[in-house]
Amino acid sequence: MKKVTAMLFSMAVGLNAGSAAAKAKASEEQETDVLLIGGGIMSATLGTYLRELEPEWSMTMVERLDSVAQESSNGWNNAGTGHSALMELNYTPQNADGSISIEKAVAINEAFQISRQFWAHQVERGVLRTPRSFINTVPHMSFVWGEDNVNFLRARYAALQQSSLFRGMRYSEDHEQIKEWAPLVMEGRDPQQKVAATRTEIGTDVNYGEITRQLIASLQKKSNFSLQLSSEVRALKRNGDKSWTVTIADLKNGTVHNIRAKFVFIGAGGAALKLLQESGIPEAKDYAGFPVGGQFLVSENPDVVNHHLAKVYGKASVGAPPMSVPHIDTRVLDGKRVVLFGPFATFSTKFLKNGSLWDLMSSTTTSNVLPMMHVGLDNFDLVKYLISQVMLSEDDRFAALKEYYPQAKKEDWRLWQAGQRVQIIKRDADKGGVLRLGTEVVSDQQGTIAALLGASPGASTAAPIMLNLLEKVFGDRVSSPQWQATLKAIVPSYGSKLNGNVAATERELQYTSEVLGLKYDKPQAADSTPKAQLKPQPARKEVADIAL
């Protein structure tokens, strides 16, 4: 009996000692040069840049979920488009005089070329493997009907021929030609309907989740990189030496520990705004966010999937904001082809698909509530659009699909809830608050913390966005000969523009296509098309893209 009692006592002491040791370990402060908050494509891309630029720097990545790339980067939570403005009509607005503005389209395309170069470089280094697992050639098409829309697309096509980035685009108003390009879109359509389409063969479908997983897997091979899953940031505090102490909660065992970091990047998607506010930096006070979700109709029926190989983008209906642009897309997800149609906007107060219903309320402060109200009043068309989308029935969504796929059958499609996107609202001296397009890097004056806010065009421009972040927070290092040489090795066109330089454009497209296993044929002479007669239009307000 005494032996049993002694044994039980020893076990109890051992367990208590183990528990005490665990608590002591939890209270220890870990030190790291760079802390990456969020396990998505932005953090993975920044970490990959820094691994080449400063291989000795230690890095820690924390992710709230139990695996990386499960929120916006997940292939099922976005449209998987390699956004390069080849088909997205909202990137080429019509000016008041009737002309077509291509400046934004050129900027979007230039940005995507940087991403292609970044990925190609990582393939050559062995960081990314099997390019077909994350990027595939899928032609990009614009498709419209009705005389005014046809005139617009014709004028858009003509305007884009001024840029070397859009060489190789084809234009047609012929039913049979368009049917050859996109059978699903044309079969069963009224043969008298006036239609037009453009097609660019070098479009891409991209699985950003797969890219993220492969980049992080490569980072994990280094001993000075640490990945902490099921880990949630609870607090950020600036220290006297300009470093940051970040409090992390382990969601599995309930322990809490601190990480002391010289630089913090908040790449947490929709959660970035709340964490930026938690940091207390003055720059955060200018921002608010408004969440918009998206749904897609999905078909995995081989009869549908094998009959469509393109991403086909339409034009927003009259009175609808550009964010409502519908598209029917070939996707390659989980190793197989599917077809998606949408997006249909949804509303939730969550900032993440796996977020909290309190996200919107908890991010609203005395400094950003007025800008939010001003934006609501100034963008009433957007408010009406969101309300109408939330009210859509199953029949309404199917009717929208049939506009792009006249012979669609309900039984071939199911509804899928994609990710959440937080649109940026920024304080404005004149208007009180404005809805900001695109993404924005927000950092403190010392360059010790930075966050990425916004949604469009999202993951497809992760490489140029993180390049911009490097220039903003590591300006002195970026200008050094060492960093300059490394950055130009990663992105050969770094520091120059491809637009207007045919030889440079073709060289980079040929290089990235070969490495990434993509289709690329030297462009032929542009199609000759009749000149479009566009009527002058009242100037349009820019509206944020849903970025799905």
Swiss-Prot record:
Q: What class of enzyme is it?
A: oxidoreductase
Keyword Metal-binding assigned: no
Its domain of life reads Bacteria
State the reactions this protein catalyses.
(S)-malate + a quinone = a quinol + oxaloacetate
The catalytic activity of this protein is classed by the Enzyme Commission as 1.1.5.4
Name a biological process GO annotation: tricarboxylic acid cycle
Can you tell me which residues the record assigns to a coiled coil? none
Q: Which UniProt keywords apply?
A: FAD, Flavoprotein, Oxidoreductase, Tricarboxylic acid cycle
Which stretches does UniProt call biased (Basic and acidic residues)? 539-548
Cofactor(s), by name: FAD
Q: Record's family?
A: Belongs to the MQO family.
Q: Which HAMAP family match?
A: MQO (MF_00212)
| NCBIfam families, A to Z | mal_quin_oxido (TIGR01320), PRK05257.1-1 (NF003603), PRK05257.1-4 (NF003605), PRK05257.2-1 (NF003606), PRK05257.2-4 (NF003608), PRK05257.3-2 (NF003611), PRK13339.1 (NF009875)
How is this protein named in the record? Probable malate:quinone oxidoreductase
Q: Specify the species.
A: Escherichia fergusonii (strain ATCC 35469 / DSM 13698 / CCUG 18766 / IAM 14443 / JCM 21226 / LMG 7866 / NBRC 102419 / NCTC 12128 / CDC 0568-73)
The record's gene field reads mqo
